[in-house]
Amino acid sequence: MKRIHHIALFGMPVLLLLFSACSIGFSNTTQDKTAPDFRLKNLEGQFVTLSEFRGKPVLINFWASWCPPCREEMPYLQQVYDEWTSKGLVLLTIDIGETPATITKYFAENNLSLLVLLDTDKEVSQEYGITGVPETFLIDRNGIIRKKQIGAYPDKKTIENDLSIIMR
């Protein structure tokens, strides 16, 4: 009985500390802050900056082709891209660390036509505080991050619901 009391007495604070430390990784510290500008190459070798889209709502998705949740989410992003770019949405995907050949092959095999930017040195993903993929940022017309989605969107409808935050 005394042993159980000691475990409870010392184990509970350790568990609380552990759970609070884990939740720190999921805190949304970037929300309501200005999105960091970047300059990345697209698959054609041309530079693209975030600042060139100032005045437009922007969805940025950090991903990689080897990531199963990214692969599941990609068709939903393509559908949103197809339907929402005519409404003014800018949808950028940022691949982390893969070669253009790998991405081009993946896009061809999956009939995707999204704009891909290459974060080959992982500087932009570090600046955005990416801890895993996929992670998505919704940025309003003033360049302010309004939502950070950690993990894959489960469906197109959920993405569209979140877009209401920045499409006003």
What do these predicted regions represent?
Residues 59-60, 91:
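Hydrophobic beta-strand anchors of alpha/beta hydrolase catalytic cores
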Residues 22-50:
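N-terminal "domain-start" segment that seeds a small globular fold
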